[in-house]
UniProtKB/Swiss-Prot annotation:
Keyword Metal-binding: no
GO cellular component: plasma membrane
Domain of life where this protein originates: Archaea
Pfam families associated with the record: CarS-like (PF01864)
GO biological process, one term: glycerophospholipid biosynthetic process
GO terms for MF: CDP-2,3-bis-(O-geranylgeranyl)-sn-glycerol synthase activity
Main location: membrane
Residue ranges crossing the lipid bilayer per the database entry: 4-24, 78-98, 118-138
Protein name: CDP-archaeol synthase
Topology term for the membrane: Multi-pass membrane protein
Annotated S-S bridges: none
Native species: Pyrobaculum calidifontis (strain DSM 21063 / JCM 11548 / VA1)
Gene from which this protein is expressed: carS
Length: 165
């Protein structure tokens, strides 16, 4: 299988998971994952932007839509897509946790946390049970900040995000 196709199939579930979680912002009622609680440092654990609804949307969309191209190419299993999507959401949550500890407000641009946290966690989990080729890893890490910036700008223009980053 072509390495470009493999790269796309590998990064698609985490991209979909990370990108679709923002759709929860459109819901009238959202429930913060941290229940509005603070960490030991007195700051919110994740903040209002990380919700149960966002996790559910992200994992579901990342699994189902992330798996869809594999119906034609058969590279990932449905379980792979689920694990990649779930790990991407966990990576995003870890990034939010770190940003809160660094006193960064919600929506504040923080490279590389915002651009790579979701992908690196997904690839780490994937590498625990399947071989991950270094050229694919490097290509994903190099391309992701550019793709992330472009998709965030599109989400901003569509009024899905408050900031273009």
């Amino acid at each position: 299988m072509n390495e470009i196709v493999q790269l796309f199939l590998l990064i698609w579930p985490p991209y979909v998971a990370n990108g679709s979680a923002v759709l929860a912002a459109r819901l009238r009622r959202r429930h913060p994952l941290d229940f509005g609680k603070n960490f030991l440092d007195g700051r919110r654990i994740f903040g209002d932007g990380k919700t149960f609804e966002g996790v559910a949307i992200g994992v579901s969309a990342g699994t189902l839509l992330g798996y869809a191209p594999n119906l034609a190419y058969s590279y990932l299993t449905l379980l792979d897509a689920f694990l990649l999507a779930t790990a991407a959401i966990v990576g995003d949550l870890l990034g939010a946790f770190v940003k809160r500890r660094l006193c960064m407000p919600r929506g504040y641009p923080a490279f590389p946390l915002d651009q790579l946290d979701f992908l690196l966690m997904a690839l780490l989990v994937y590498s625990l049970y399947r071989e991950l080729h270094i050229p694919l890893l490097l290509a994903a890490v190099v391309l992701t900040p550019v793709i992330h910036r472009a998709t965030n700008y599109a989400a901003y223009k569509l009024r899905l995000k408050k900031e273009p980053w």
